[in-house]
Amino acid sequence: MKIPLLLQNKKKLLKIMGLFFLLMIISFFLLRNTVLNWAIDKVATKFKNKYHGEFSVQHAVFSGISAIALQDICLTSPAKDTLLNIEQLDANIKILPLLLAHIRLDEVFIDSTNIAIFKTAKKDNISFLLKSNKQEKKDSIDKRKGNIDIGNLAYNFVKTIFDVIPQKVQVLSTSIELQRDTAYFKTTIDTVSFIDGHFHCNINTVESKGKSLYILNGDVNKDERTLNFSLYPHQIKEQTSFPILKSFLNLSISFDTLFVALNHTDYDSDILQLEGKALIKKGALNHWRISPKDIALDYAEVNYKFNVGVAELSLDSSTSIKLNKMLIKPYIHYQHSPKKTLAFDFKIPKMDAQEFFVSLPTGLFQNLEGIQAKGELGFNMHFFMDTEVPDSVEFVCAMPKNKFKITSYGEARLSKLNEEFLYTAFERGHPIRSFLVGPSNPNYNALANISPYLQNALMTSEDGNFYWHNGFNENAFRKSIAENYKKGRFARGGSTISMQLVKNVFLTRNKTIARKVEEALIVWLIESNRIASKERMYEVYLNIIEWGPGIYGAGEASAYYFNKKAADLTLAESIYLAMIVPRPKWFKYNFDETGKLKPHVADFYRIIANHLVRKEIITEEQKLALLPDITLAGPAKELILIKDTLGVDSLNLPELDLMLESD
């Protein structure tokens, strides 16, 4: 008898639930306009309390079973300046998801949208949104720190984006206006259409830097969670700059075609995988931090795969990049917990050497343009750091080659190191003096005519392994990375004498990313192909480095400080000259008002002397007899007696032992 009773109770329960559900639906239809306006008022009140601005909808009503019509939607700042205005927004809401408290739109129609954002000295209608929520965001981040599942968070974000995309969208007459100080941008979009997974729009832009018209086409598959789009200028020959970037970031990007695709989305075993493709044709880029000239690239293609885990992000090793004919295989892995680690691998498999150089973007490495080579050339770099043990950092860099040979040097004329040439010294980016590096210059000194004490003291201080490395001191570079990370700032460099020489002789003084990479490439070309001997490189270096105000080379320095020839420098004088190379214009701060070296200098003398003893350059007796005591006899003597108006007591150099490279 119990079973029929249970069935009867179950039927009653189902009837009650059905009735309750029906009442909810009826109540919703009867009260839907009231509920809609109540919800809008609640949003408006919350916005006003939080940001002191105003959110309003002039007219809001349900029309039909599931259609909402909103008119005159407005968002204003506390100063009553309008950020957003939409004259009309009609949307069809899917009923079933709505009953489950999920808003899913079926169709959307928007007409006459105006967005105006200003941040100038006289007008600012956006800062109130950015400032009000700072502490709340910080508290939220602090609360969740260490407990965020990055993979799940990213997956839910991607899933939500695809879920909320309506089946059909039509947007008419959109205007977006942005201004920050003197930078100005305005775009108008007549029509945006999205029907059956395909979207299209024309984008007209007006900037302080010019006008442009772009066409955007693409497809979205909500079920598969894939998408792709193409963006290209209306008239390809115009090579117009991509909107906004030029005005606000001083970054100019132009192209014939930009294509981006997300081809696969998968979430399995707590890892989100995103795979896709991006390519650009006839691209050009310009930014003063990258290169002083336009960087041009005929073709670039990326086939990417991102992995996002619970506490890690990675660019998968299956990712490939193609620059013209060059294939690049990158790998990046960042782990947030239980400890922070960063791994980076960058590989260019060996390829035809001429195609290697031709594939480099023009304008990026100006000195390498026109270079001719044969054989094969590649590139490998590996980096790994465990932030808990920064001293264990791994860094390996190499350019494997096969029968590689330079047949023509192109723009750089790297072989000029073996000849007499005109050198121009720069200060703060401006040329201040030019002189010949060679026998025609009376201040020039061959290596044999420069004191061995100076040669070895300077090499010990600047690059102790100069004669044994191939232009790059990986051990010094690893120490530099670790030291800079531990101190949280740039505290130690890793440049070798070869790198300093190339920077001074071949490159501009523009501090750009391209210059640093070009510096490394030229160093490798010179060192690995023996374009100039180590002895010749060091000889040129000793004759061009700055050693004081307007003083260049060992010949001028020995006369300026000691009124003697470079060959006659003593051990104490040589160590002093080696010490001031990092900051030659500060030399006078090493002396007190009596003309004697200050006590702190003794540490540098001791460290250099110990290294020279180990290298058997000097004897133990010479070290014991060495005193940090020199007598200025040249024009420099007149400067040290001038009272120090800056109030500097000592030379603010990095820790002395960090200036020295290990043997």
Where are these regions (language model features)?
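N-terminal Lys/Arg-rich, disordered targeting/topogenic segments
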Residues: 1-11
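N-terminal amphipathic/hydrophobic interface segments
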Residues: 10-11, 15-76
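Juxtamembrane regions of bacterial inner-membrane/periplasmic proteins
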Residues: 42, 105, 153-166, 185-200, ...
